[in-house]
Amino acid sequence: MRMNEPVDAQPAPSFLPMSRRFRGYLPVVVDVETGGFDWNKHALLEIACVPIEMDTDGRFFPGETASAHLVPAPGLEIDPKSLEITGIVLDHPFRFAKQEKDALDHVFAPVRAAVKKYGCQRAILVGHNAHFDLNFLNAAVARVGHKRNPFHPFSVFDTVTLAGVAYGQTVLARAAQAAGLDWNAADAHSAVYDTEQTARLFCKIANAWPGPV
């Protein structure tokens, strides 16, 4: 042992901490279900968020899911065809929908906590066709004048691109199956289910990719 070497010196970890792995951004998977395709015209109806966590070996895993059903914002439209696809029943007695501001507060709080936990600067949205989700999220933030949006305003990680490179698949169901994940078509088009499956897909790809040193 060298004279100046600390007795209890530990080897440096072979992976970057979360705060440095993605340039200070914490990946957070988001999925929204909506009343159509136009974020300035159609209502936001469901949202779910899953922060990506890191274990002591530097491997990624999905964190806890935060989700909310939303009361359609006044003046926005809902295309009946969208409800047919999602299966959302707006007047269901157990929907327990929140106003937009309350719903955003509900899902943003654990995201901010995860950003703080890992010493990151802010969250970066991960999604399948991620800009669709980000545009609806940003539109809702603007409508209610939310001042504590933890997400980067325009940058995303899109699992369409990642899965296309990793597995040659761009449809979420096919990409998940190519990654060896289970897929239940009956549960698809729920914000919670799609978010959790996208989070598993992102972790599977990210864990297979050697991080920077």
From Swiss-Prot:
GO terms for biological process: DNA replication proofreading; tRNA processing. Mg(2+) 2 binds at D31, E33, H189, D194. The active site is at H189 (proton donor/acceptor). Binds two Mg(2+) per subunit. The active form of the enzyme binds two Mg(2+) ions in its active site. The first Mg(2+) forms only one salt bridge with the protein. The record marks F37, F132, F154 as: Important for substrate binding and specificity. GO terms for molecular function: 3'-5' exonuclease activity; magnesium ion binding; nucleic acid binding; RNA exonuclease activity, producing 5'-phosphomonoesters. Keywords: Exonuclease, Hydrolase, Magnesium, Metal-binding, Nuclease, tRNA processing. Mg(2+) 1 binds at D31. InterPro entries: Exonuclease_RNaseT/DNA_pol3, RNase_T, RNaseH-like_sf, RNaseH_sf. Residues 28-202 form the Exonuclease domain. Homodimer. Belongs to the RNase T family. NCBIfam families: RNaseT. This is Ribonuclease T. It comes from Xanthomonas euvesicatoria pv. vesicatoria (strain 85-10). The lineage of its organism: Bacteria, Pseudomonadati, Pseudomonadota, Gammaproteobacteria, Lysobacterales. The gene is rnt.
